[in-house]
């Protein structure tokens, strides 16, 4: 299957640069791939798509202020590090700029030396493994020195960093937000729960690979990035009970889908408590094992996320829905509007 099969025209002005004032006031395109229907709505009406006894599954990861600006103590050259994932202890995989100046043994200081990084390994594409040294608690030091790592297609400064977090963000570790969840308010979640829908949380720490375009023509040659996930026993039991009672598992976003389908694939369709690393690539031809419906934002052309949605709803219908969204001036990407896929 060719990457170009998932391309579409997207006017640049439809790429949302800032969040709307109210999280749940974004537009919602409701599509049903069996009936081949599309309905224009608003996000706070997502409650009408959920039935008593369903489970709404959300990713409770929290975005780290993962962009650090520092300098080399020997040359005073400026350095930017973007934290990708914690590999062990105080060691992190990072994206470094300018990478060519950062060889094994190089040091970088941040915040007058309150945080120091030593390069201990060189990876491809500007990647490095660094070991941090600091006084106190790492996350507190990071909160004081780091900046929120907004996606490369957002050029406006974010006034309130919490708008790039979901209202239920809890587990620190992501380099990017699980953006399908940004539309939910605490009030909307209370109403959904009052309707008899089970609110279930899992964790997948989103890496920067989520923004990387597919660089090969043949999808079979694409290497997916790896991300850490976790599902608790309590959450797994709730999902098993929902399935057994005939309810649906409704995922919020592609990160929740990838976690649930990783677990479903590992346990032959059963839902078990689990944690580990996943590089699952869901593309047309994939048979879904756990997820019955989902919400998601509008994604980049030729991205693995468009391929995932196409695997569920069919490529032609998804691209038709995207053309409709462009015609109706839906807002795209992280701060954009959403779709609900039945």
Curated annotation (Swiss-Prot):
Signal peptide: none annotated. Keywords: Cytoplasm, Queuosine biosynthesis, S-adenosyl-L-methionine, Transferase. InterPro entries: QueA, QueA_dom1, QueA_dom2, QueA_sf. It is found in: Cytoplasm. Pathway: tRNA modification; tRNA-queuosine biosynthesis. It is an enzyme of class 2 (transferase). One of its GO terms (biological process) is tRNA wobble guanine modification. GO terms for cellular component: cytoplasm. It catalyses: 7-aminomethyl-7-carbaguanosine(34) in tRNA + S-adenosyl-L-methionine = epoxyqueuosine(34) in tRNA + adenine + L-methionine + 2 H(+). Its EC number is 2.4.99.17. Transfers and isomerizes the ribose moiety from AdoMet to the 7-aminomethyl group of 7-deazaguanine (preQ1-tRNA) to give epoxyqueuosine (oQ-tRNA). Belongs to the QueA family. Monomer. This is S-adenosylmethionine:tRNA ribosyltransferase-isomerase. It comes from Streptococcus pyogenes serotype M1. The lineage of its organism: Bacteria, Bacillati, Bacillota, Bacilli, Lactobacillales.
């Amino acid at each position: 299957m060719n990457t170009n099969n998932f391309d579409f025209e997207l006017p640049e002005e439809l790429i949302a640069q800032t969040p709307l004032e109210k999280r749940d006031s974004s537009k919602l395109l409701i599509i049903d791939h069996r009936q081949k229907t599309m309905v224009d709505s608003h996000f706070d009406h997502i409650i009408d798509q959920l039935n008593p006894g369903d489970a709404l599954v959300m990713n409770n990861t929290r975005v780290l202020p993962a962009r650090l600006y520092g300098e080399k103590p020997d040359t005073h050259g400026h350095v930017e590090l973007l934290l990708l994932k914690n590999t062990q202890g105080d060691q992190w995989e990072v994206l470094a700029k300018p990478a060519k100046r950062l060889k094994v043994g190089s040091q970088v200081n941040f915040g007058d030396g309150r945080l120091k990084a030593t390069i201990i390994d060189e990876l491809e594409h500007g990647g490095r493994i660094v070991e941090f040294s600091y006084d106190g608690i790492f996350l507190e030091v990071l909160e004081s020195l780091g900046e929120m790592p907004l996606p490369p297609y957002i050029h406006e400064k974010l006034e309130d960093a919490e708008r790039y977090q979901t209202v239920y963000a809890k587990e620190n570790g992501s380099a990017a937000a699980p953006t399908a969840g940004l539309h939910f308010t605490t009030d909307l979640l209370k109403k959904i729960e009052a309707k008899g829908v089970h609110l279930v949380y899992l964790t997948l720490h989103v890496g920067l690979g989520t923004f990387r375009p597919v660089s090969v023509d043949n999808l079979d040659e694409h290497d997916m990035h790896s991300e850490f996930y976790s599902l608790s026993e309590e959450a797994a039991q709730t999902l098993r009970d929902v399935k057994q009672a005939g309810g649906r598992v409704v995922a919020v976003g592609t990160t929740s889908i990838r976690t649930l389908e990783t677990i479903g694939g590992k346990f032959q369709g059963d839902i078990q408590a689990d944690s580990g690393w996943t590089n699952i690539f869901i593309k047309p031809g994939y048979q879904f094992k756990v997820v019955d419906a989902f919400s998601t934002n509008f994604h980049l052309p030729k991205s693995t996320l468009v391929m995932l949605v196409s695997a569920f709803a069919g490529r032609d219908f998804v691209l038709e829905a995207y053309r409709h969204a462009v015609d109706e001036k839906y807002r795209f990407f992280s701060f954009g509007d959403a779709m609900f896929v039945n």
